[in-house]
Amino acid sequence: MRYVVFLLCILSFHAAAQSPAPPVVKEGNTFKISQHVYVIPDELVPMVPNVGIVVGTKATLVVDPGMGRRNGEAVLREAKKLSRNTEFYIVNTHFHPEHATGEAGFPPEAKVIRAAAQQQDIEEMGMQWVQNFASRSPGIAETLQGITGFRKPAEVFEKEKTLDLGGVRVRLLRLGPGHTRGDTVFFVEQDRVLFSGDLAM
């Protein structure tokens, strides 16, 4: 009997993973995991990343702001609840649309920082991936509506960069190729928290 229950649990989990739930970042669900780091969890919803928010005394860093403008706007609202910072940086673990196109929901003065290899991925394949994702379901197509390109980075780095947010430093490390050519991880030094994206699933 317990084997049947176990099998049913597996089938239920598989069905849930395949369900056409809209890829929406859940507002009001942000929680603190360390002194400077907050996470909006993916809630096991397909096409929703675990969004990271790192808050310093001078600036806020957002990691993987989700898919499309509306999700990006939701992430920005959550980030603004955590501090009075007006300076925002946006980084992505890789260029896939469910991680990177939420940049569109941030104001123009928010600064995007990318590894050169990730920028190359975007220039060569970015919109092709957006179109591919949009063709998968009406919900994803609606989420990506209005995405006609990726934001231009304020800064591009080759292998490594350290970002000082005020009282907390974040190391940006390009580790790809792995999941993609431009895979980048973000290590919050004081908190010893690592954002690895789809390199670790």
Each PLM stretch: what is its role?
Residues 4-14:
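Bacterial N-terminal signal peptides
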Residues 20-21, 25-27, 32, 120-175, ...:
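Metallo-beta-lactamase
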Residues 30-78, 184-198:
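Conserved beta-strand hairpin/beta-sheet module of binuclear metal-dependent hydrolase folds
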Residues 34-35, 48-49, 85, 92, ...:
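Extracytoplasmic
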Residues 38, 91, 111-113, 155, ...:
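Hydrophobic/aromatic beta-strand patches that form the interior of the parallel beta-sheet core
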Residues 48, 70-71, 95-101, 119-122, ...:
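Active-site environment of divalent metal-dependent phosphoester hydrolases
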Residues 57-61, 69-114:
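Active-site metal-binding motif and surrounding structural segment of the metallo-beta-lactamase
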Residues 83-87, 107-110, 114-117, 122, ...:
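Sec/Tat-exported extracytoplasmic proteins
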